[in-house]
Amino acid sequence: MGGQGTWHIGLHHPSLFAALAPQAGWSTLHVYQPFAMQPSRMFASPEILLSRERARHDANNLFFLENAEHLPVIITQGAKDKTVPPMHARLFQKLLEIRDYRVNYRELQDKAHWWDEPRSEGGGSDALDNKEIIEFLRKQKREIPNSFKIRLYDLSLNDRFYW
């Protein structure tokens, strides 16, 4: 699930993490995979459409962005990404900054969705084993906030937080 999984799990369970480091994560399923012209939408009954919309609402990461209030975020995005276009990462950055949340944004101009360049030290791919991201994450600590707001969609999925 990559960047999408990072956003989804991190924003649904913010107390489990000290920070988030999504890479190429989409903002909302409706933008990533438009469904307006799909035959299943055009020919479905209103009842089916309503059920489908309710099920898909949980895939709207922007709805849950408020849950990042106490999570520092480092976003990495390839500027040449055609799988998850950079507009998603830029939107996250902008919305986090508007809220005064802690966000670092890295848009790599010559990179696409994935790159296999080796790290300068040791093995692995720089796409995953990036020194800047790892150092950012090592500096973070989970702290109990004095106050918080949580945005939930389904209490049966995430109704407990360590704070």
Regions found by a protein language model. Give the residues of each.
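Short, solvent-exposed turn/loop segments enriched in Gly/Ser/Thr/Pro and often Arg
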Residues: 1-3, 23-26, 109
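Hydrophobic/aromatic beta-strand patches that form the interior of the parallel beta-sheet core
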Residues: 21, 74-76, 106
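Active-site neighborhood of glycoside hydrolase catalytic domains
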Residues: 58, 70, 88-102
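Short beta-strand/loop motif that positions the catalytic acidic residue
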Residues: 68, 74-77, 81
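Conserved alpha/beta-hydrolase "acid-adjacent" motif
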Residues: 82-88
